[in-house]
């Protein structure tokens, strides 16, 4: 099992390079179509995109095993929320890869009777559930870091002798209960929360990259399942950005969100 996981990790970089090239072809094909390129050139780009997609499916054979191993490790996490989000995400990834393997068998001719449309819809559903769990985990970690940042700021203010009881609720000429002061206070609180969020993400690049990557990936299953039609241009752009961020985490392992 460990030997297979190591082999899968080695092929991961090639799969992500193919993924970046595939979505670059999708984006290029959309641009060529909008600018009235020749049908022959558009056909060649679509064929290249299809070959890259099939090649990625070949490289992902057996990734279900890797996802199940990751789920087994996540079960032992001490934080209940992280344990749930990460475990469920990996289990959905395992099911997604299993459906992807069936699709590869159908497209390669090994199982010509496979209903590819049905299995593609299943795979994108599992992919969507996995991304939802990933984003939930990101939101939870952001909340924890924002609470830590707020507590640290309060301690610094107490040490310096500045009172912070009430926080931003004490700001405003009309007080928290008066109509004249409520709207400016809400605007100030919202601005402070945005600044705090920006500070937290700036101080934790792995979390920032994970949020961006999952947010970009989310458009792909939403479009494929018909839940939110984005168009091939948006899907290609988001897929390309996500692929570049994934490659970046392979080149710089410290940018990978842990656990």
Curated annotation (Swiss-Prot):
Disruption-associated phenotype: Mice have a marked decrease in peroxisome abundance. They share several phenotypes with Zellweger syndrome mouse models, including neuronal migration defects, hypotonia, a developmental delay, and neonatal lethality but no detectable defect in peroxisomal protein import and only mild defects in peroxisomal metabolic function.
Chief localization: membrane
Entry keyword Nucleotide-binding: no
Location of the protein in the cell: Peroxisome membrane
An MF annotation (GO) of this entry: protein homodimerization activity
Annotated membrane topology: Single-pass membrane protein
Keywords: Acetylation, Membrane, Peroxisome, Peroxisome biogenesis, Transmembrane, Transmembrane helix
Positions of modified residues (N6-acetyllysine): 43
Family matches, as InterPro entries: PEX11
Span list, region Interaction with PEX19, PEX11G and FIS1 and peroxisome targeting: 211-259
Highest taxon of source: Eukaryota
One Gene Ontology term, aspect cellular component: protein-containing complex
Family: Belongs to the peroxin-11 family.
General function of this protein: Involved in peroxisomal proliferation. May regulate peroxisome division by recruiting the dynamin-related GTPase DNM1L to the peroxisomal membrane. Promotes membrane protrusion and elongation on the peroxisomal surface.
Protein name as annotated: Peroxisomal membrane protein 11B
Name of the coding gene: Pex11b
């Amino acid at each position: 099992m460990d030997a297979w996981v190591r082999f899968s990790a080695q092929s991961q970089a090639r799969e992500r390079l193919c993924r970046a090239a595939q979505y670059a072809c999708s984006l290029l094909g959309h641009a060529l179509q909008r600018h009235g390129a020749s049908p022959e050139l558009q056909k060649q780009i679509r064929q290249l995109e299809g070959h890259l997609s099939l090649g990625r499916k070949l490289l992902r054979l057996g990734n279900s095993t890797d996802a199940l191993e990751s789920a087994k490790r996540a079960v032992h996490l001490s934080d209940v929320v992280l344990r749930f989000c990460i475990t469920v995400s990996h289990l959905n990834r395992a099911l997604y890869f299993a459906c992807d393997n069936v699709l590869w068998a159908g497209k390669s001719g090994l199982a010509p009777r496979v209903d590819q449309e049905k299995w593609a819809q299943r795979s994108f559903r599992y992919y969507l559930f996995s991304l939802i769990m990933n984003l939930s985990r990101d939101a939870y970690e952001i909340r924890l870091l924002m609470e830590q940042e707020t507590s640290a700021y309060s301690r610094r203010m107490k040490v310096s002798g500045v009172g912070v009881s009430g926080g931003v609720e004490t700001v405003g000429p009309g007080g928290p209960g008066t109509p004249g002061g409520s709207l400016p206070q809400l605007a100030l609180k919202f601005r402070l929360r945005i600044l705090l969020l920006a500070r937290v993400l700036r101080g934790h690049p792995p979390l920032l990259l994970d949020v961006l990557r999952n947010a970009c990936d989310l458009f792909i299953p939403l479009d494929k399942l018909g839940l939110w039609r984005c168009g091939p241009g948006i899907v290609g752009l988001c897929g390309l950005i996500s692929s570049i961020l994934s490659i970046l985490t392979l080149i710089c392992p410290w940018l990978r969100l842990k656990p």
